[in-house]
């Protein structure tokens, strides 16, 4: 994959990470609100756990993409 495509993929990943971070923050607020009202929050916590897994996957993808970008940089310098 060419460098521009990798950079675009990285930008897309950063947007996804930001979005999931916002969703996690909102879900935490929902949980606090539910628990504060004495309501069951199990489903909300389950959703939060899923969002946190998704966040981790996006972070792993970002790490791999950054490594790919670094590799393409060093390869371009040696050619």
Q: What is each residue range found by the language model?
A:
Residues 1-79:
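Anionic, Ser/Thr-rich low-complexity intrinsically disordered regions
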């Amino acid at each position: 994959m060419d460098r521009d495509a990798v950079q675009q993929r990285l930008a897309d990943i950063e947007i996804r990470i930001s979005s999931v971070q916002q969703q996690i923050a909102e879900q935490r607020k929902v949980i606090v609100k539910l628990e504060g009202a004495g309501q069951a929050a199990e489903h909300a916590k389950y959703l939060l756990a899923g969002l946190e897994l998704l966040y981790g996957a996006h972070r792993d993808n970002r790490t791999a993409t950054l490594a790919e970008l670094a590799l393409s940089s060093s390869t371009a310098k040696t050619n």
